[in-house]
Amino acid sequence: LLTGNGLTSLPPSLAVAEQEASVTSLTTKRYILRFPALETLMLDDNKLSNPNCFVSLAGLKRLKKLSLDQNRIFRIPYLQQVQLRDGSGDWVGGRGSPRKQPQSMLQSKSWIYEASDDQPDYTILPMKKDVDRTEVVFSSYPGFSTSETTKVCALPPIFAILPVALFPSLCELIFHNNPLVAHTRGVPPLLKSFLQERVGIHLIRRKIVKAKHHILMPRKDSRKVKTQVPKVPKQPMILPHPSVMIKSPSKEMLESEAELTTEPPPTKTISVEREMPIEGLGGPPMPHRTFVPLPPICSDSTVHSEETSPRSDAAGRLSADQLSDEDTKSTESIFLTQVSGLSSSIFQRDDSEIKEKEQRPPSTAPREAKRTQKKPPSASFPRKYHGYEELLTAKPDRPCSTCVKHPLVYRSSKPRLDTLQKHYVPKEKRTRRIPVPPRRKTRAQLLDDILIRMRDTQNITEAPLGAVLRQRTEQRLVNQKQFLEAKKLLKEFRARYRRLVRCSLRSVFGTTAPPQARPALSGSQPKLGRFLEFMDEFYQEPTASDLKG
């Protein structure tokens, strides 16, 4: 295993080594195989590019699997087969059977695949056009002849794998991720028919990728959306409070009002109070009204403002239509805030108070003016919000308030909505105690256990005889071997009992023929086992001397 070592070349004496001169004579040379039993060689993920590396591998006669992936190999040379003598005197041949020759000199022989009828099935011809490109000369290696040029087949680059057939016992070749097969796909039919089907070399030119298991995501029923949630409007629907429309007159109008207010009629304040809610809610719709802004608030002088409506019958009041353009331009605007959250009970109370005041005699104007400032207008809802009056009169719902105070936070897929849920509190993680590993046995103890197991190889199964014999037919089929052993044991007990009875009768009556033995006890009787155990313990079979006497 030489994976990922960054090797650029292999030593020439990797597989075959020459003996020393002291051992051999000067006239003869002998070579020894270094790895005669090597069958698998992994040279993947290296930088092998020189064809000389195949010269180093040519002496491995039992090489079956060769891995050359992720290297820089662009061709494999054709090597002349040379017969070598190993230490035992055998000649190293090719895929054919090795043979011996009396000569000790190296004899080169061209490689030709011969069939059974001694005629060449195929031959390898050299390329005549470009000899320098295909010629490979190995001058320093003693085991291969360099007298003849290397023969290369005039085929596309993928056919440079054909010289692999010269390896005697090669069965599998892995050569992907090399320049040799970088620009081609698949195995050509010629290589497949020759190398795989004839010679028996399995070619692997693609990296084997293990199939990944398909990831299945479980579908949970709780995650399915079965109902459509209605769209929430951007602006919530809120019942608006009746807006107050106020006008600010000019200086001339203020002076005229001052003259009129010196002698106010007693019924004027009542009409203003009754007209205020009508103007706010019962009057014309919002887009048709004329809004008049308020003047700036001054601390020195007080500004009197009044509200007018087209329905008012009070004389001496100026309406918004009578204002001139100059007066409206001279005024400044002030924004009023909307009061929300008022219950309808307040509005109903104001309506009842207004009715009582209408029935009562009118009082002084300043007191009534102070009261009007404190009382809000009555509630009269427009048609747009018809049907929502109960929202203002409804009492607070206790279940709703508890749901708001206790939000539902679940960690389970099926929560119980009929009960109050507790807040999720994460549990503290507790570290588990690591179990103490058993004490490791020494080598002597392990060896003793192995010897004990080898010595005692019997497997003993204890079972009551009566329970095994009383089993049903279904259980007998399951434990058929156990039932047969119990039946055989019962047969032996019966034979031993008969033998005991015969021996006892012979000892009593002498040579007289014993009477016919009674049938043995059935195996279903529970006392049979105890009786046989008692007889085996206290009775010994009679010897030959006892029988003679």
Curated annotation (Swiss-Prot):
Q: Where is this region: Disordered?
A: 221-242, 277-329, 347-384
Record's signal peptide: none
Instruction: Report the superkingdom from the record.
Output: Eukaryota
| PROSITE patterns to which the protein is assigned, alphabetical | LRR
A GO cellular component term found in this entry reads: nucleus
| Chain coiled-coil ranges | 480-500
Quote the subcellular location field of this record: Cytoplasm; Nucleus
| One biological process term in Gene Ontology | response to X-ray
What this chain does, per the entry, is described as: May be involved in the response of cells to X-ray radiation.
Q: What is this protein called?
A: X-ray radiation resistance-associated protein 1
Q: Which gene encodes it?
A: XRRA1
